[in-house]
Every structure is written in C-alpha cells, then in structure tokens.
C-alpha cells in the first residue's frame, strides 16, 4: 500500500473524529471551508473547486492539502478552540498550506508525513494565538512561520528529505493568460495553468 493510500485511509478515519455531534456531511463541509479559506472563501463549494484545481496539477498535493486541513481542524477541536471558528474553516486553511508545502519542498515519506501532522497542528495553535490578540491579523502567518521552521530544521537535521530547487521557466512571462493563471495557482503552490 502506497504512502498516499495510507494517508487517505488515515484521513478517512480522522474525518470521523472531527468536531463531535456533527455528521459526515458537516465534517466534509468543514474541510471544504478550510480549503476555501485559503482564498478567504467561507464556502465549502469554493474549497472543493479549489481542491479540484489542485488535483489538476497533482493528486498527491491534493491529498496532502486535505491531510493538512483535517489535522489542523482536529487539533483545534482537541484544544477546544471556538466551535464556530472551527466550522468556518479558520483553523484548517493554514494546515492546507502546510500540507501542500510539505509536498512541494520535501520528499514524501513517513518523516515528511509526520512533519505535516506536527506542522498542521502547530499552525492551528499559532493561528489561535493570532486570533486572541487584535493588533495584527494572522491570515497565513501561521503557515509561513511553521513552514520556515520545518524547512530550517530539515536543512540542518535531515537535508536529504528536501527536494532540489527547480529553475524558473522564463517563457511563461511572455504569455499574459499563462502568467495570470500560474500566479493565481501559485497561491496554493500549483504550477499548472488549469489550477489557476
């Protein structure tokens, strides 16, 4: 069984434990809203459409995105954060981005999946810290801080897990539609025109 199949099975099992007293449909809506919140959309359908865009680029990144969303949401639920914020997907979207970043920057193996779980959970805690103060909005700062921490840690402790950097393709800048679509897709690390 591949790491992606195992991840999918774990996600399904974890999905059953999302905020208590809710059904499977509500749990799926929470996940959809969590993904949708990456683009400030408190709407499950928007999140599902964004997930389809990710799938157009990479089904593996889509699984990691859902995994990050589920872990971030479960962490918030276990830490008894505000239920309405959880239902709105406010603790899932940073996990979504952490999951995608793991797939973009790291080789997928048991260590990177463990880092995804740890990173998505910590991103919920950091998001909660931002929500408790009113001086500075958090937005994606929890994701950025957590991924920086993960990348720096891996760079010094386990550099073999990090993927090599890819060079840019200078031809894309000459085509407006391609560039526009690629830029929108890059919000979720998707390098595919259909994803944008």
Q: What are the residue ranges of the model-derived segments?
A:
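N-terminal signal-anchor module of multipass membrane proteins
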Residues: 2-81, 181-196
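C-terminal ends of transmembrane helices
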Residues: 72-84, 123-133
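Phenylalanine-focused residue identity feature
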Residues: 8, 17, 40, 93, ...
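Membrane-interface helix-loop-helix junctions at boundaries between adjacent transmembrane segments
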Residues: 90, 95-166
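Long hydrophobic alpha-helical segments that form multi-pass transmembrane helix bundles
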Residues: 13, 17, 141-195
């Amino acid at each position: 069984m591949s790491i992606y199949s195992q991840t999918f099975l774990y996600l399904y099992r974890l999905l059953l434990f999302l905020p208590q007293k809710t059904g499977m449909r509500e749990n799926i809506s929470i996940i959809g809203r969590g993904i949708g919140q990456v683009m400030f959309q408190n709407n499950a359908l928007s999140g599902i459409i964004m997930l389809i865009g990710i799938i157009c680029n990479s089904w593996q990144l889509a699984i990691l995105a859902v995994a990050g969303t589920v872990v971030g949401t479960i962490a918030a639920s276990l830490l008894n954060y505000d239920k309405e914020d959880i239902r709105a997907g406010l603790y899932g979207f940073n996990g979504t981005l952490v999951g995608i970043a793991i797939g973009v920057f790291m080789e997928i193996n048991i260590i990177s999946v463990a880092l995804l779980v740890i990173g998505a959970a910590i991103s919920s805690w950091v998001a909660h810290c931002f929500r408790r103060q009113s001086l500075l909005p958090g937005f994606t700062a929890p994701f950025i801080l957590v991924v920086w921490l993960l990348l720096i840690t891996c760079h010094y402790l386990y550099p073999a897990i990090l993927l090599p950097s890819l060079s840019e393709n200078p031809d894309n800048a000459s085509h407006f539609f391609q560039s526009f679509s690629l830029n929108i897709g890059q919000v979720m690390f998707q390098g595919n025109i259909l994803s944008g």
